[in-house]
Amino acid sequence: MLLNPKHAYFAQKMLSDLRNEKKHMLFYLTAASTVGGMHREEYKEYFAKEASSEMQHVIEFQNALLGLGVDLTETNDAVEFNHYILSYSPIELLDYALKMESEVVANYAHRIKEDVKLLSEPDQTWMENFYEEQLVKSREDVDNLRMLLRTV
């Protein structure tokens, strides 16, 4: 399906969000293995759970892009991801996770306020709801990470 220019612009924004979700997934997978310290097992379990959650986000974004008519087999954007930090320190890993999640909360709020308006109905309402759900999940992660960082 050929996208009109406004839909194509929105699709590029979504592909950027997909790359971020892949970065999050890979970060949490790596952190589950590299995290050190006395509470390593608890952090390992936490990061592994978050990796699983991020994998679900990746699937949700890919499905939404397909629903908008984006052919994921025709774009390298669908397989690329952004880089992330490597560390053994639980504090550094949690702090980085907080920065990542805070960034996507801001991105998703912007998508809802600005970018979704580029779409026509019913895609506009669908994407507003999609991004609102993603925003809630990521904001809950931000709040949880803030609480975790208070105790380390």
Language model regions located:
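Short, charged, low-hydrophobicity "junction" segments
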Residues: 1, 45, 79-84
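Disorder-to-helix initiation segments
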Residues: 1-17
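Short alpha-helical hairpin
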Residues: 1-5, 27, 77
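Short, contiguous strand/loop micro-motifs
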Residues: 4-5, 37, 48-49, 121-122
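DHp/HisKA histidine-phosphotransfer helix
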Residues: 10, 43-47, 127, 131
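Acidic/histidine-rich alpha-helical segments that form the ligand environment
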Residues: 13-20, 24-31, 35, 63-64, ...
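Conserved alpha-helical segments that form or flank metal/cofactor-binding pockets of metalloenzymes
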Residues: 39-76, 141-148
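Short, contiguous alpha-helical
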Residues: 56, 127-152
